[in-house]
């Protein structure tokens, strides 16, 4: 199970919500091992407003905050998941502006995933039409069974 999926399951939350964000971007920041392509920088990815799952970046939180605040706002929810799905897992619910201080308080220096997005806030959203009782698709015909005789 990928860390982002395991972490979302532990949080018991959806990563997409109608009219808030319908896209999840899995990414990381540049590190010692390799740089990131310019077109995949957080400054560019952040323009989408998508839910972000940022791996391998706990030591780059200053950059994460600086790159994303113009697009998401300093009060945007951020969740740090240390050692997702492990017995010693820790979850820190904070904001873009507060995440560095919280991570320092908890002494987290590695093995953490950073989620950023409005889907994690106290938001009101319209339920997806996909689950509406009157929404018909190939696997659901809104309770109207076809008669075999009519075929």
PLM regions: where:
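Short glycine-cluster motifs
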Residues: 1-31
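A contiguous loop/helix-start segment that scaffolds small-molecule binding in enzyme catalytic cores
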Residues: 21-23, 27-151
């Amino acid at each position: 199970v990928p860390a982002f999926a395991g972490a979302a399951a532990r949080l018991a939350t959806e990563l997409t919500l109608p009219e808030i964000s319908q896209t999840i971007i899995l990414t990381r920041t540049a590190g010692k091992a390799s740089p990131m392509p310019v077109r995949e920088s957080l400054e560019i990815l952040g323009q989408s407003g998508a839910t972000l799952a940022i791996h391998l970046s706990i030591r780059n939180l200053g950059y994460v905050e600086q790159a994303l605040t113009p697009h998401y706002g300093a009060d945007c929810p951020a969740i740090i998941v240390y050692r997702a799905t492990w017995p010693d897992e820790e979850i820190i619910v904070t904001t873009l502006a507060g995440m560095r201080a919280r991570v320092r308080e908890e002494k987290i220096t590695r093995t953490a995933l950073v989620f950023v997005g409005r889907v994690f806030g106290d938001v009101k959203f319209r339920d997806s039409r996909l689950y509406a009782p009157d929404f018909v698709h190939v696997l659901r015909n809104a309770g109207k069974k076809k008669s075999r005789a009519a075929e």
